[in-house]
């Protein structure tokens, strides 16, 4: 099996712009990417590909193979799946709470497809045993769409429901979860800029 991580560093994570500058966001997404790669390698996945529209930020990448594709996310991934001859795990790059243990559990499914839902109806990971028979359609309520795609193509699927694997970092409030539950370089980076504070019974971020 192999894993593929869609990734774009330039202008990344615009929804974090209220709390992080462009430079900080680009530094942060690179740290998250490296943690995801480390988790994949820790789970025993030797072949890790990064699918990106640009080499920006990946010039010195040695832990994964960089594949350039300027097409949109769905077109690029569907081309990748069509050419794959072994099971594929698609993992988003903004999952710093994802562990090797999660990855092992996801990829050990007895079903044809394992779908990891993200917040707001998204899809954080997809394990596909027969990639040439499956297509992806991200954006919008992609989790429901990916369930339907599996059913319509005659493939049974499992839903891997996990808080940690389901926590993608998109909004400022997601950084709270990273500080509470995370570890590693991505957490350390945010911890160098913010502290947690309880206000009106809710935990929030306060700049240092």
Curated annotation (Swiss-Prot):
Its EC number is 2.7.7.68. InterPro entries: CofC (IPR002835), Nucleotide-diphossugar_trans (IPR029044). One of its GO terms (biological process) is F420-0 metabolic process. One of its GO terms (molecular function) is phospholactate guanylyltransferase activity. It holds the Pfam family CofC. Keywords: GTP-binding, Nucleotide-binding, Nucleotidyltransferase, Transferase. Disulfide bonds: none annotated. Signal peptide: none annotated. It catalyses: (2S)-2-phospholactate + GTP + H(+) = (2S)-lactyl-2-diphospho-5'-guanosine + diphosphate. Pathway: Cofactor biosynthesis; coenzyme F420 biosynthesis. SUPFAM superfamilies: Nucleotide-diphospho-sugar transferases (SSF53448). Belongs to the CofC family. Homodimer. Guanylyltransferase that catalyzes the activation of (2S)-2-phospholactate (2-PL) as (2S)-lactyl-2-diphospho-5'-guanosine, via the condensation of 2-PL with GTP. It is involved in the biosynthesis of coenzyme F420, a hydride carrier cofactor. This is 2-phospho-L-lactate guanylyltransferase. The gene is cofC.
């Amino acid at each position: 099996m192999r894993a593929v991580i869609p990734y774009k560093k330039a202008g990344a994570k615009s929804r974090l712009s209220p709390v992080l500058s462009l430079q900080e966001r680009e530094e942060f997404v690179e740290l998250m990417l490296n943690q995801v790669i480390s988790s994949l390698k820790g789970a025993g996945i030797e072949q890790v590909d990064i699918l990106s529209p640009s080499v920006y930020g990946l010039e010195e990448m040695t832990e994964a193979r960089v594949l350039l594709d300027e097409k949109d996310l769905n077109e690029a991934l569907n081309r990748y799946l069509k050419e794959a001859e072994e099971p594929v795990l698609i993992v988003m790059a903004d999952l710093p709470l994802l562990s090797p243990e999660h990855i092992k559990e996801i990829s050990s499914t007895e079903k044809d497809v394992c779908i990891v839902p993200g917040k707001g109806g998204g899809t954080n990971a997809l394990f596909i045993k027969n990639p040439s028979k499956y297509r992806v359609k991200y954006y919008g309520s992609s989790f429901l769409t990916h369930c339907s795609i599996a059913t319509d193509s005659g493939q049974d699927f499992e839903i891997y429901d996990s808080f940690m694997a389901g926590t993608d970092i998109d909004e400022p409030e997601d950084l709270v979860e990273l500080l509470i539950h995370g570890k590693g370089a991505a957490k350390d980076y945010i911890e160098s800029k913010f502290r947690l504070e309880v206000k009106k019974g809710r935990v929030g971020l306060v700049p240092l």
